[in-house]
Amino acid sequence: MSIVTPYEDLLRFVLETGTPKSDRTGTGTRSLFGQQMRYDLSAGFPLLTTKKVHFKSVAYELLWFLRGDSNIGWLHEHGVTIWDEWASDTGELGPIYGVQWRSWPAPSGEHIDQISAALDLLRTDPDSRRIIVSAWNVGEIERMALPPCHAFFQFYVADGRLSCQLYQRSADLFLGVPFNIASYALLTHMMAAQAGLSVGEFIWTGGDCHIYDNHVEQVRLQLSREPRPYPKLLLADRDSIFEYTYEDIVVKNYDPHPAIKAPVAV
């Protein structure tokens, strides 16, 4: 059986042809601009198999975003520490992803729940070209612990299938992007379930797609491994997208190669 490997193909392409660049963290990267990956979500759940991805962290982070939360306290209650490097002493991160998704400030003083608005359009006007959620709030970026890397996503319905395209302005290919692929694939499954649709494609579009210089050996190790079949996602029935719990999300037949550790560039 042929296994599609969009992520590994992009990783190899950047490793072999990327341009050396400096970066905000001072680590150094090799980078390409404007790359894309496509996954057919009906063919399997795109949780990478060439290294183990910590799916518990992926799922809890998405549930945390959907809560509209900006404090790592809830993540800590569930044993997830992936945001610790950027949080304040009190655990605050400012108006990051979840706040913008669920409570974008309007000029009137009210707040816009972009997730609910997107779901409403999927149900009532699925051919709309305006089913968009943005985390890139220019007026609040300075208050965010980290400006959004995965900044903007759009939903598209055709033949009863829901597809999602993400634009990621800054893509740490080795550490960050495997999480992002799984997270938005999971979100697409949730949105499809709530709108009575099947899943279509997840399309990832990257701006600055980079491999940090101190990740190169880990990348070479990952690319030396044979890919395995993708797992299957099972999602419990819930009346609202905001009611899902971690126990409602099950990944079956996930058989990855071992995890590969690498330092985070902060």
Swiss-Prot record:
This is Thymidylate synthase ThyA. CDD domains: TS_Pyrimidine_HMase. Its EC number is 2.1.1.45. Belongs to the thymidylate synthase family. Bacterial-type ThyA subfamily. It comes from Mycobacterium tuberculosis (strain ATCC 25618 / H37Rv). DUMP binds at residues 24, 129-130, 169-172, 180, 210-212. It comes from the Bacteria. Homodimer. Pathway: Pyrimidine metabolism; dTTP biosynthesis. Changing residue 205 to A: Appears to be functional by complementation study. GO terms for biological process: dTMP biosynthetic process; dTTP biosynthetic process; dUMP catabolic process; methylation; response to antibiotic. HAMAP family: Thymidy_synth_bact. It holds the Pfam family Thymidylat_synt. (6R)-5,10-methylene-5,6,7,8-tetrahydrofolate binds at residues 54, 172, 265. GO terms for molecular function: thymidylate synthase activity. Keywords: Antibiotic resistance, Cytoplasm, Methyltransferase, Nucleotide biosynthesis, Transferase. Catalyzes the reductive methylation of 2'-deoxyuridine-5'-monophosphate (dUMP) to 2'-deoxythymidine-5'-monophosphate (dTMP) while utilizing 5,10-methylenetetrahydrofolate (mTHF) as the methyl donor and reductant in the reaction, yielding dihydrofolate (DHF) as a by-product. This enzymatic reaction provides an intracellular de novo source of dTMP, an essential precursor for DNA biosynthesis. Induction: Is expressed under the exponential phase of growth, and down-regulated upon reaching the stationary phase or under both oxidative and nitrosative stress. Expression of thyA is significantly increased within murine macrophages or under acid stress. Is expressed at a higher level than thyX under all of the in vitro and in vivo growth conditions tested. Mutations within this gene have been associated with resistance to p-aminosalicylic acid (PAS) in some PAS-resistant M.tuberculosis clinical isolates and spontaneous mutants. It seems that functional ThyA is required for M.tuberculosis to be sensitive to PAS. It catalyses: dUMP + (6R)-5,10-methylene-5,6,7,8-tetrahydrofolate = 7,8-dihydrofolate + dTMP. Is potently inhibited by 5-fluoro-2'-deoxyuridine 5'-monophosphate (FdUMP), and by the folate-based 1843U89. It is found in: Cytoplasm. Disruption phenotype: Cells lacking this gene display an in vitro growth defect, but deletion of thyA does not affect M.tuberculosis in vivo growth. Moreover, thyA deletion confers PAS resistance.
